[in-house]
Amino acid sequence: MIRWMNHNALRTTRRLTMAAAGLVVLASIAPRSADAQRYVARADSLLRRGRVFAAETLYYYAVRRAPRDPAARLALGRYLAARGALRIGAVLMEEARFFGGDPKTVGTYLAPVYARLGDYKALSSLPGSPLPYAQRARAEWLGANLPSVEGPDSATITLYPVDSGSLGEIELVVGSDTIRAAIDPRVQGISLDTAWLRRKSVKQFAATFDNDWRNVGGVALSVGVGPFMLTNVPTGFSATGDLKRAKVGLDFLAQLAPTLNPVTHTMTLRKSGRIDRTAPGERIPTLSYPGGLWLVQRDGVWPLGGTMAATTLGTRPFTLNARRGELIVESR
Protein backbone atom coordinates (compact mmCIF):
# COMPACT_ATOMS: atom_id res chain seq x y z
CA MET A 1 0.00 0.00 0.00
CA ILE A 2 2.80 2.40 0.92
CA ARG A 3 4.69 1.45 -2.24
CA TRP A 4 1.55 2.20 -4.34
CA MET A 5 1.07 5.58 -2.64
CA ASN A 6 4.72 6.49 -3.26
CA HIS A 7 4.36 5.54 -6.92
CA ASN A 8 1.17 7.59 -7.24
CA ALA A 9 2.80 10.58 -5.56
CA LEU A 10 5.75 10.28 -7.92
CA ARG A 11 3.45 10.36 -10.96
CA THR A 12 1.64 13.40 -9.58
CA THR A 13 4.95 15.14 -8.95
CA ARG A 14 6.07 14.45 -12.52
CA ARG A 15 2.83 15.85 -13.94
CA LEU A 16 3.14 18.98 -11.84
CA THR A 17 6.78 19.38 -12.86
CA MET A 18 5.91 19.05 -16.56
CA ALA A 19 3.04 21.51 -16.22
CA ALA A 20 5.29 23.98 -14.42
CA ALA A 21 7.94 23.57 -17.12
CA GLY A 22 5.30 24.25 -19.77
CA LEU A 23 4.23 27.41 -17.99
CA VAL A 24 7.85 28.54 -17.79
CA VAL A 25 8.27 27.99 -21.54
CA LEU A 26 5.06 29.88 -22.30
CA ALA A 27 6.10 32.67 -19.98
CA SER A 28 9.41 32.99 -21.83
CA ILE A 29 7.79 32.85 -25.30
CA ALA A 30 5.14 35.51 -24.65
CA PRO A 31 7.58 38.38 -23.95
CA ARG A 32 9.66 37.41 -27.00
CA SER A 33 6.58 37.44 -29.21
CA ALA A 34 5.57 40.84 -27.84
CA ASP A 35 9.09 42.14 -28.47
CA ALA A 36 8.97 40.79 -32.03
CA GLN A 37 5.71 42.64 -32.68
CA ARG A 38 7.25 45.89 -31.48
CA TYR A 39 10.22 45.39 -33.82
CA VAL A 40 7.86 44.70 -36.73
CA ALA A 41 5.85 47.85 -35.98
CA ARG A 42 9.05 49.92 -35.87
CA ALA A 43 10.26 48.32 -39.11
CA ASP A 44 6.96 49.15 -40.85
CA SER A 45 7.30 52.76 -39.73
CA LEU A 46 10.90 52.99 -40.94
CA LEU A 47 9.95 51.49 -44.30
CA ARG A 48 7.23 54.08 -44.86
CA ARG A 49 9.81 56.80 -44.19
CA GLY A 50 12.20 55.38 -46.78
CA ARG A 51 14.72 53.86 -44.34
CA VAL A 52 14.63 50.52 -46.10
CA PHE A 53 17.85 48.99 -44.78
CA ALA A 54 17.15 49.95 -41.16
CA ALA A 55 13.69 48.41 -41.56
CA GLU A 56 15.20 45.25 -43.03
CA THR A 57 17.48 44.87 -40.01
CA LEU A 58 14.52 45.05 -37.63
CA TYR A 59 12.43 42.56 -39.66
CA TYR A 60 15.28 40.06 -39.42
CA TYR A 61 15.82 40.81 -35.73
CA ALA A 62 12.12 40.22 -34.97
CA VAL A 63 12.37 36.72 -36.48
CA ARG A 64 15.56 35.96 -34.58
CA ARG A 65 13.93 37.19 -31.37
CA ALA A 66 10.84 35.00 -31.85
CA PRO A 67 11.62 32.32 -34.49
CA ARG A 68 8.17 30.73 -34.27
CA ASP A 69 6.12 33.91 -34.20
CA PRO A 70 3.93 33.81 -37.35
CA ALA A 71 3.44 37.58 -37.56
CA ALA A 72 7.20 38.21 -37.52
CA ARG A 73 7.83 35.63 -40.25
CA LEU A 74 4.94 36.98 -42.33
CA ALA A 75 6.29 40.53 -42.08
CA LEU A 76 9.80 39.49 -43.13
CA GLY A 77 8.42 37.35 -45.95
CA ARG A 78 6.27 40.21 -47.27
CA TYR A 79 9.21 42.60 -47.15
CA LEU A 80 11.63 40.28 -48.96
CA ALA A 81 9.05 39.45 -51.64
CA ALA A 82 8.42 43.16 -52.19
CA ARG A 83 12.18 43.63 -52.61
CA GLY A 84 12.34 40.95 -55.30
CA ALA A 85 13.37 37.89 -53.25
CA LEU A 86 10.17 36.09 -54.19
CA ARG A 87 11.10 32.50 -53.38
CA ILE A 88 12.62 33.31 -49.98
CA GLY A 89 9.65 35.52 -49.16
CA ALA A 90 7.22 32.76 -50.12
CA VAL A 91 8.99 30.22 -47.91
CA LEU A 92 8.85 32.56 -44.91
CA MET A 93 5.13 33.15 -45.43
CA GLU A 94 4.54 29.41 -45.71
CA GLU A 95 6.40 28.98 -42.42
CA ALA A 96 4.24 31.71 -40.86
CA ARG A 97 1.17 29.63 -41.69
CA PHE A 98 2.87 26.47 -40.36
CA PHE A 99 3.59 28.22 -37.05
CA GLY A 100 -0.06 29.14 -36.56
CA GLY A 101 -0.66 32.14 -38.81
CA ASP A 102 -4.21 32.58 -40.10
CA PRO A 103 -4.33 30.82 -43.52
CA LYS A 104 -6.59 33.49 -45.03
CA THR A 105 -4.33 36.34 -43.89
CA VAL A 106 -1.21 34.57 -45.12
CA GLY A 107 -2.94 33.55 -48.35
CA THR A 108 -3.82 37.16 -49.14
CA TYR A 109 -0.13 38.08 -49.25
CA LEU A 110 1.17 34.78 -50.61
CA ALA A 111 -1.14 34.48 -53.64
CA PRO A 112 0.38 37.39 -55.65
CA VAL A 113 3.88 36.13 -54.85
CA TYR A 114 3.07 32.67 -56.23
CA ALA A 115 1.64 34.37 -59.33
CA ARG A 116 4.82 36.40 -59.88
CA LEU A 117 6.91 33.26 -59.39
CA GLY A 118 4.80 31.42 -61.94
CA ASP A 119 4.18 28.71 -59.34
CA TYR A 120 0.62 28.05 -60.44
CA LYS A 121 0.34 24.62 -58.84
CA ALA A 122 1.04 26.15 -55.45
CA LEU A 123 -1.34 29.01 -56.24
CA SER A 124 -4.22 26.73 -57.20
CA SER A 125 -3.89 24.67 -53.99
CA LEU A 126 -3.16 27.56 -51.60
CA PRO A 127 -4.84 27.03 -48.18
CA GLY A 128 -7.17 29.89 -47.31
CA SER A 129 -6.93 31.14 -50.89
CA PRO A 130 -8.38 34.62 -51.50
CA LEU A 131 -8.87 33.80 -55.19
CA PRO A 132 -12.39 33.48 -56.63
CA TYR A 133 -13.30 30.36 -58.57
CA ALA A 134 -12.32 31.76 -61.98
CA GLN A 135 -8.79 32.63 -60.89
CA ARG A 136 -8.30 29.29 -59.16
CA ALA A 137 -9.44 27.52 -62.33
CA ARG A 138 -7.02 29.64 -64.36
CA ALA A 139 -4.17 28.79 -61.98
CA GLU A 140 -4.94 25.07 -62.34
CA TRP A 141 -4.87 25.38 -66.14
CA LEU A 142 -1.63 27.38 -66.11
CA GLY A 143 -0.07 24.77 -63.83
CA ALA A 144 -0.55 22.26 -66.64
CA ASN A 145 0.21 24.76 -69.45
CA LEU A 146 3.13 26.82 -68.21
CA PRO A 147 3.83 30.25 -69.73
CA SER A 148 6.97 30.57 -71.83
CA VAL A 149 9.12 33.20 -73.55
CA GLU A 150 10.84 32.74 -76.90
CA GLY A 151 13.05 35.20 -78.73
CA PRO A 152 16.57 36.62 -79.00
CA ASP A 153 18.85 37.31 -76.05
CA SER A 154 17.93 41.00 -76.21
CA ALA A 155 16.13 43.44 -78.48
CA THR A 156 15.14 47.09 -78.61
CA ILE A 157 11.59 48.17 -79.43
CA THR A 158 9.85 51.52 -79.81
CA LEU A 159 8.58 53.28 -76.68
CA TYR A 160 5.87 55.69 -77.77
CA PRO A 161 5.70 58.88 -75.67
CA VAL A 162 2.48 59.95 -73.96
CA ASP A 163 1.38 63.17 -72.31
CA SER A 164 0.84 61.76 -68.81
CA GLY A 165 -0.58 58.88 -66.79
CA SER A 166 1.84 56.19 -67.95
CA LEU A 167 5.51 55.57 -68.69
CA GLY A 168 4.88 55.34 -72.43
CA GLU A 169 3.24 52.91 -74.80
CA ILE A 170 4.40 49.81 -76.65
CA GLU A 171 2.89 47.64 -79.36
CA LEU A 172 1.68 44.15 -78.54
CA VAL A 173 0.44 41.45 -80.88
CA VAL A 174 -2.32 39.47 -79.20
CA GLY A 175 -3.28 36.56 -81.41
CA SER A 176 -3.29 38.21 -84.83
CA ASP A 177 -4.23 41.72 -83.62
CA THR A 178 -1.75 44.54 -83.07
CA ILE A 179 -2.70 46.82 -80.18
CA ARG A 180 -1.16 49.75 -78.32
CA ALA A 181 -0.55 49.17 -74.60
CA ALA A 182 0.15 51.88 -72.03
CA ILE A 183 2.74 51.01 -69.37
CA ASP A 184 0.95 51.68 -66.09
CA PRO A 185 2.81 50.90 -62.82
CA ARG A 186 -0.55 50.57 -61.04
CA VAL A 187 -1.69 47.68 -63.26
CA GLN A 188 -0.95 43.99 -62.73
CA GLY A 189 -0.16 41.91 -65.82
CA ILE A 190 -2.06 42.75 -69.00
CA SER A 191 -5.46 44.43 -68.97
CA LEU A 192 -7.49 44.09 -72.20
CA ASP A 193 -10.82 45.58 -73.20
CA THR A 194 -13.86 43.42 -72.48
CA ALA A 195 -14.35 42.96 -76.24
CA TRP A 196 -11.55 40.38 -76.01
CA LEU A 197 -13.90 38.13 -74.05
CA ARG A 198 -15.44 37.17 -77.39
CA ARG A 199 -12.13 36.30 -79.07
CA LYS A 200 -10.65 32.84 -79.42
CA SER A 201 -7.11 34.15 -78.86
CA VAL A 202 -7.99 34.67 -75.18
CA LYS A 203 -9.02 31.71 -73.04
CA GLN A 204 -11.63 32.49 -70.39
CA PHE A 205 -12.31 31.11 -66.93
CA ALA A 206 -15.59 31.95 -65.20
CA ALA A 207 -18.08 30.47 -62.76
CA THR A 208 -21.10 28.88 -64.48
CA PHE A 209 -23.67 31.24 -62.97
CA ASP A 210 -21.52 34.39 -62.81
CA ASN A 211 -22.07 36.83 -65.69
CA ASP A 212 -19.93 39.63 -64.25
CA TRP A 213 -16.91 40.17 -66.53
CA ARG A 214 -14.97 41.60 -63.58
CA ASN A 215 -14.80 38.09 -62.13
CA VAL A 216 -13.54 36.46 -65.33
CA GLY A 217 -9.96 35.20 -65.47
CA GLY A 218 -8.25 35.27 -68.84
CA VAL A 219 -5.18 33.83 -70.54
CA ALA A 220 -3.84 35.33 -73.76
CA LEU A 221 -2.59 32.31 -75.67
CA SER A 222 0.13 34.33 -77.41
CA VAL A 223 1.46 37.86 -76.93
CA GLY A 224 4.16 39.30 -79.15
CA VAL A 225 6.43 42.05 -77.82
CA GLY A 226 8.79 43.01 -80.62
CA PRO A 227 10.66 39.79 -81.53
CA PHE A 228 9.67 38.08 -78.27
CA MET A 229 6.75 35.66 -78.16
CA LEU A 230 5.11 35.00 -74.80
CA THR A 231 2.62 32.16 -74.48
CA ASN A 232 -0.18 31.60 -71.96
CA VAL A 233 -0.08 35.06 -70.40
CA PRO A 234 -2.51 35.76 -67.48
CA THR A 235 -4.86 38.54 -68.49
CA GLY A 236 -7.44 40.80 -66.87
CA PHE A 237 -10.18 42.90 -68.42
CA SER A 238 -11.50 46.45 -68.18
CA ALA A 239 -14.21 48.34 -70.04
CA THR A 240 -12.15 50.80 -72.12
CA GLY A 241 -14.42 50.80 -75.17
CA ASP A 242 -11.44 50.29 -77.49
CA LEU A 243 -10.33 46.84 -78.65
CA LYS A 244 -6.99 48.24 -79.81
CA ARG A 245 -6.00 49.77 -76.46
CA ALA A 246 -4.64 47.96 -73.42
CA LYS A 247 -2.54 48.45 -70.30
CA VAL A 248 0.46 46.50 -69.06
CA GLY A 249 2.02 46.52 -65.62
CA LEU A 250 5.70 46.57 -64.81
CA ASP A 251 5.35 43.05 -63.39
CA PHE A 252 4.61 41.88 -66.94
CA LEU A 253 7.67 43.66 -68.34
CA ALA A 254 9.88 42.76 -65.36
CA GLN A 255 10.40 39.23 -66.67
CA LEU A 256 12.28 40.83 -69.60
CA ALA A 257 14.36 43.24 -67.45
CA PRO A 258 13.36 46.36 -69.42
CA THR A 259 15.42 49.51 -69.91
CA LEU A 260 13.22 52.51 -70.72
CA ASN A 261 14.83 55.47 -72.48
CA PRO A 262 12.49 58.49 -72.64
CA VAL A 263 15.01 60.46 -74.73
CA THR A 264 15.47 58.00 -77.59
CA HIS A 265 11.92 56.61 -77.18
CA THR A 266 13.17 53.04 -76.98
CA MET A 267 12.88 50.07 -74.65
CA THR A 268 15.48 47.32 -74.42
CA LEU A 269 14.26 43.87 -73.37
CA ARG A 270 16.27 40.85 -72.23
CA LYS A 271 15.07 37.27 -72.54
CA SER A 272 16.96 36.09 -69.45
CA GLY A 273 15.39 38.77 -67.26
CA ARG A 274 18.80 39.33 -65.67
CA ILE A 275 20.95 42.44 -65.29
CA ASP A 276 24.72 42.41 -64.83
CA ARG A 277 25.56 43.21 -61.21
CA THR A 278 28.26 45.60 -62.43
CA ALA A 279 25.87 47.59 -64.63
CA PRO A 280 26.60 51.31 -64.10
CA GLY A 281 24.08 53.76 -62.68
CA GLU A 282 22.40 54.98 -59.53
CA ARG A 283 20.55 52.18 -57.74
CA ILE A 284 17.22 53.08 -56.18
CA PRO A 285 15.58 50.40 -53.97
CA THR A 286 12.07 49.43 -55.00
CA LEU A 287 9.08 47.81 -53.32
CA SER A 288 6.69 45.84 -55.50
CA TYR A 289 3.13 45.39 -54.26
CA PRO A 290 -0.13 44.43 -56.02
CA GLY A 291 -0.96 48.16 -56.10
CA GLY A 292 2.18 49.06 -58.03
CA LEU A 293 5.91 49.68 -57.86
CA TRP A 294 7.29 52.11 -55.27
CA LEU A 295 10.61 53.92 -55.16
CA VAL A 296 12.39 54.18 -51.81
CA GLN A 297 13.72 57.70 -51.31
CA ARG A 298 15.37 59.48 -48.39
CA ASP A 299 12.16 61.34 -47.59
CA GLY A 300 9.72 58.47 -48.04
CA VAL A 301 8.35 55.88 -50.41
CA TRP A 302 6.79 57.15 -53.64
CA PRO A 303 4.85 55.35 -56.41
CA LEU A 304 6.59 55.05 -59.76
CA GLY A 305 4.52 57.10 -62.15
CA GLY A 306 3.73 59.71 -59.51
CA THR A 307 4.99 63.29 -59.38
CA MET A 308 7.77 62.67 -56.85
CA ALA A 309 9.14 59.69 -58.78
CA ALA A 310 8.98 61.64 -62.04
CA THR A 311 11.02 64.42 -60.45
CA THR A 312 13.64 61.89 -59.32
CA LEU A 313 13.94 60.18 -62.69
CA GLY A 314 13.49 63.15 -65.00
CA THR A 315 14.29 62.06 -68.55
CA ARG A 316 17.09 59.70 -67.55
CA PRO A 317 17.00 56.12 -68.89
CA PHE A 318 16.31 53.52 -66.20
CA THR A 319 16.35 49.74 -65.93
CA LEU A 320 14.00 47.67 -63.81
CA ASN A 321 16.02 44.98 -62.04
CA ALA A 322 13.12 43.21 -60.37
CA ARG A 323 15.20 40.24 -59.19
CA ARG A 324 17.23 42.53 -56.92
CA GLY A 325 14.46 44.99 -56.07
CA GLU A 326 16.01 48.06 -57.64
CA LEU A 327 15.77 50.63 -60.38
CA ILE A 328 19.10 51.38 -62.07
CA VAL A 329 19.03 54.99 -63.22
CA GLU A 330 21.60 56.43 -65.61
CA SER A 331 23.86 58.89 -63.82
CA ARG A 332 23.27 62.57 -64.46
Predicted segments with their positions:
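Generic low-complexity segments that are intrinsically disordered, proline-rich and/or Lys/Arg-biased
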Residues: 8-11, 32, 286
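Hydrophobic h-region of N-terminal signal peptides that target proteins for export
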Residues: 22-31
